[in-house]
């Protein structure tokens, strides 16, 4: 009876062996990355076995399904959890919940004369199968069919990554069919919650790739941070070499400014590595420049630029250590070395005798106890309007004297009083004839012209003088113009290195008008010159408060026809001396 039924069903099956009309239905699958099938089929591994009863029952079900499809009756074959069919010794495993609604199941689960071989892919340690697709081999005259997989592993040859981070698949050169990407393999997915249409399928492999990418990016950022923090070099003995190493380091990470004795160098580098932590002297130098005041910082830079010029005299001073060592070697018979060193000292003293002598006298000046008390009392507390000195039609109050404290700006009264002291000293023998204008002279001349200051020289003939001093006040800065009538030149001296060509031209025109008025003669302007002293020719201030002191000391040295050899570090001493000189109306 069973044989007759099998023959009938076989006849019906042969009549139905043709493609089913219509498109294939959807496959609803819920599988993890560990249930991917293998691409390789090895027929030698499994020996052939005789058909069993369960294979026959499965063939009957397939025949009924094909018959129902032929006559148009709706029919569904729902597999139970883990349904296994053995046909010629091959075992097919399908997850629970899978629905097969087209003729592909007939081709997949073939009849007794077929041999379909499925092999599960080996699982990798991360739970992802190494084989992303399944291949079904049919021994009958049916063409080979390939069931595309719905996921790719990172080890798959068909998996590639674009520079933008998106994934796409390439065709396998060994396969005759073209594989489609995962996004295109499934175009629809029915939601379990009564989904509302089309959405992109969820893929565990994709989540793993995204996590892997995020992890790589996080590690890259950590490496960049570690490279930025760990790029500092240990301090070396040489300061210049350490600065050079730090400069090379900062060139690769951002922009860097180096300020060395007033010279400023800026390196521009890509903006994305702009800010980097550094250690060492360069960082402290930058922080000092960042938080310093604007004016004081500018003056400090200018002063540092010419610090070497102010210390030239110190470099030329005889080395006392050499002299002491030479004397200690007298008993050792090194007379030749001693003679050479003594000759060097003599040459240095011959080259700069007056400069060294003047500087030493200034530095070796000592105040007595009485002088110290007078100076401290004048600079101490008291009524600011109290008059402490009166001469030259000027009155100096306690408030005026207190401008001589360290880091205070001098006012007009103190500067005018000191200029008059210089004029009084010039009346002594051995000093050049000197005249000094008030600090209000130049502003009046500039605003009102010659007629506004015509009477300022009523009792003085400027052309009988040898030197004429004109203090200049430019907003918040003091400078000096020296008219040397002997050399027919005007010199502008500025402790900040500024130029005063326009000021010299105005004063030269004043001399021309003065000559016409007092002597009825014109000056030969071709014989006169004016010149702004360059910063390396005169001492420069290193702060923002000693411009008035520099102006007074310029006038002091020039009125004695002495070279200007003082430096910034002598300003506290000069301030104390000026207090005593104004109180006693006498220059020391």
UniProtKB/Swiss-Prot annotation:
Where are the Phosphoserine residues found in this chain?
32, 332, 343
Q: Keyword set for this entry? A: Activator, Cytoplasm, Cytoplasmic vesicle, Hydrolase, Membrane, mRNA transport, Nuclear pore complex, Nucleus, Phosphoprotein, Protease, Protein transport, Thiol protease, Transcription, Transcription regulation, Translocation, Transport, Ubl conjugation, Ubl conjugation pathway, Wnt signaling pathway
The cross-references to Pfam families, in alphabetical order and at most eight, read:
Peptidase_C48
- Output the PROSITE patterns linked to this UniProt entry: ULP_PROTEASE
Identify the enzyme class: hydrolase
InterPro entries from the xrefs? Papain-like_cys_pep_sf, Peptidase_C48_C
Annotated segments matching region Disordered:
157-184
Found, by tissue, as follows: Highly expressed in testis. Detected in brain, heart and thymus.
The Gene Ontology biological process annotation of the record reads: fat cell differentiation; heart development; labyrinthine layer development; mRNA transport; negative regulation of DNA damage response, signal transduction by p53 class mediator; negative regulation of protein ubiquitination; negative regulation of signal transduction by p53 class mediator; positive regulation of protein ubiquitination
Protease as annotated region, ranges = 394-558
One GO MF term: deSUMOylase activity
Motif location (Nuclear localization signal)? 28-31, 47-52
EC code: 3.4.22.-
Where do we find the motif Nuclear export signal here? 316-331
Q: Where are the transmembrane segments?
A: none
Q: What is known of its domains?
A: The N-terminus is necessary and sufficient for nuclear envelope targeting.
Entry function:
Protease that catalyzes two essential functions in the SUMO pathway. The first is the hydrolysis of an alpha-linked peptide bond at the C-terminal end of the small ubiquitin-like modifier (SUMO) propeptides, SUMO1, SUMO2 and SUMO3 leading to the mature form of the proteins. The second is the deconjugation of SUMO1, SUMO2 and SUMO3 from targeted proteins, by cleaving an epsilon-linked peptide bond between the C-terminal glycine of the mature SUMO and the lysine epsilon-amino group of the target protein. May down-regulate CTNNB1 levels and thereby modulate the Wnt pathway.
This chain belongs to which protein, by name? Sentrin-specific protease 2
Q: Which organism is it from?
A: Mus musculus
């Amino acid at each position: 009876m069973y044989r007759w039924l099998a023959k009938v069903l076989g006849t019906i099956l042969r009549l139905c062996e043709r493609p089913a009309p219509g498109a294939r239905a959807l496959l609803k699958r819920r599988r993890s990355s560990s249930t991917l099938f293998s691409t390789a089929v090895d027929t030698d591994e499994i020996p052939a076995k005789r058909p069993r009863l369960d294979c026959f029952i499965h063939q009957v079900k397939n025949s009924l399904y094909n018959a129902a499809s032929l006559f148009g009756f709706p029919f569904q074959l729902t597999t139970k959890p883990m349904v296994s069919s053995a046909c010629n010794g091959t075992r097919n495993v399908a997850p629970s919940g899978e629905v097969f609604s087209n003729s592909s199941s007939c081709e997949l689960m073939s009849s007794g004369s077929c041999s379909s071989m499925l092999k599960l892919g080996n699982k990798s340690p991360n739970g992802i199968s190494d084989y992303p697709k399944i291949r079904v081999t049919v021994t009958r005259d049916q063409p080979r069919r390939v069931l595309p997989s719905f996921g790719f592993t990172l080890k798959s040859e068909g998996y590639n990554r674009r520079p933008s981070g998106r994934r796409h698949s390439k065709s396998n050169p060994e396969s005759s069919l073209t594989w489609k990407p995962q996004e295109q393999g499934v175009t629809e997915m029915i939601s379990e919650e009564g989904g509302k249409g089309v959405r992109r399928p969820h893929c565990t492999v994709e989540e793993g790739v995204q996590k892997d990418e995020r992890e790589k990016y996080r590690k890259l950022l950590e490496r960049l941070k570690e490279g930025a923090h760990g790029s500092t070099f240990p301090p070396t003995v040489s300061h210049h070499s350490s600065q050079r190493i730090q400069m090379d380091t900062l060139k690769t990470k951002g922009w860097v400014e180096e300020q060395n004795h007033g010279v400023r160098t800026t390196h521009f580098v890509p903006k994305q590595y702009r800010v980097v932590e550094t250690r060492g002297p360069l960082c402290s130098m930058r922080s000092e420049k960042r938080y310093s005041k604007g004016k004081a910082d500018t003056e400090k830079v200018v002063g540092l630029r010419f610090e070497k010029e102010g210390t030239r005299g110190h470099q030329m001073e005889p080395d006392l250590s050499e002299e002491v060592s030479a004397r200690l070697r007298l008993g050792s018979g090194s007379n030749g070395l001693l003679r050479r060193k003594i000759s060097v000292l003599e040459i240095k003293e011959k080259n700069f005798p007056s400069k060294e002598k003047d500087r030493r006298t200034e530095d070796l000046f000592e105040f007595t106890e009485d002088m110290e008390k007078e100076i401290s009392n004048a600079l101490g507390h008291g009524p600011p309007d109290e008059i402490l000195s009166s001469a030259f039609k000027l009155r100096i109050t306690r408030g005026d004297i207190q401008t001589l404290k360290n880091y205070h700006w001098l006012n007009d009264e103190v500067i005018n009083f000191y200029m008059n002291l210089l004029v009084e000293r010039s009346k002594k023998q051995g000093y050049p004839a000197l005249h000094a204008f008030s600090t209000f002279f130049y502003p009046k001349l500039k605003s009102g012209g010659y007629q506004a200051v015509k009477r300022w020289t009523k009792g003085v003939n400027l052309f009988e003088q040898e030197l004429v001093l004109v203090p200049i006040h430019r907003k918040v800065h003091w400078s000096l113009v020296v008219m040397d009538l002997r050399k027919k030149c005007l010199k502008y001296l500025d402790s900040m290195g500024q130029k005063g060509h326009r000021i010299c031209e105005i004063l030269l025109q004043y001399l021309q008008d003065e000559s016409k008025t007092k002597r009825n003669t014109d000056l030969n302007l071709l014989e006169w010159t004016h010149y702004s002293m360059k910063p390396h020719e005169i001492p420069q201030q290193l702060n923002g408060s000693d411009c008035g002191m520099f102006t007074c000391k310029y006038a002091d040295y020039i009125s004695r026809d002495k070279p200007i050899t003082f430096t910034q570090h002598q300003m506290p001493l000069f301030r104390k001396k000026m207090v005593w000189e104004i109180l006693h109306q006498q220059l020391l």
